[in-house]
């Protein structure tokens, strides 16, 4: 009887030890850790946010390594290209004078010179990209800058201003506009615009233009009240003459089109009874016959002595004759088919 009792006590001890071990492993049953379950009493460690390097407006527009570097140094690149072209032209001229007068520069040599020039241009932009965004290679940097140009409205506006400045320089160099008058015009327009905005301010403190007002119209009214007119950009004499010639050519073409549109004589196929007869002429004194275009014009039956053209004109166009011939051919073909069917029936009956 002692052996079963010993085995039962051992089993009880083992079950107690297992339950204790499970309780020790469960953190919810630990009274000392009740307040630290959610980590409330643990000290907080504040860390600075890691900055991610990216190509943005700040990096491209404001930093000296961005677009300001290109605007400042792009003329040097153009100067280097011009120097290389002049050097290449001098070398080819020496070859032409020393070798033979019929010497021509080989095409491959021209291509090699262009490749060297493009290589120097790419090297310039590679250095610029590396200075602006060192973490990316040249291909990735060009891709990032291109995407920023599509997304950023500030960069698009900046690019538009640069293009307008270059167009203005070209117009001044070619004599299309006068630089001094254009600058005065822009200054007067800016002054008129500021005066218009200040004049529209009321006692309520509204600094915006009133609804429905046109800024340019307000500017004209303001300048007219002061007894002044807005200056217009002056053109050179050559440009003015060219504009006058263009206007004259356009007006001549428009007049010819209007004259052609007003010609409705081709619609008078059948004149009415009350219509006035055409004035007699030398060509209309003889009886008219069928013309080459298919028109049948008979002589006047009421006045056979003069032989003037009759008011009633009968039109017989070529396409009507063709349709009539086709109808006659179809009728003949139908007659032939009916005759063949009758012969076949007679043959079957036999």
Swiss-Prot record:
Bias-annotated ranges (Polar residues): 191-202, 223-241, 300-315
Keywords: Cell cycle, DNA damage, DNA repair, DNA replication inhibitor, Meiosis, Nucleus
Low complexity bias (residue ranges): 281-299
One MF annotation (Gene Ontology) recorded for this entry: DNA binding
A Gene Ontology BP annotation from the UniProt entry: replication fork processing
Entry similarity comment: Belongs to the CSM3 family.
Its job: Forms a fork protection complex (FPC) with TOF1 and which is required for chromosome segregation during meiosis and DNA damage repair. FPC coordinates leading and lagging strand synthesis and moves with the replication fork. FPC stabilizes replication forks in a configuration that is recognized by replication checkpoint sensors.
Protein name, as recorded: Chromosome segregation in meiosis protein 3
Species lineage: Eukaryota, Fungi, Dikarya, Ascomycota, Saccharomycotina
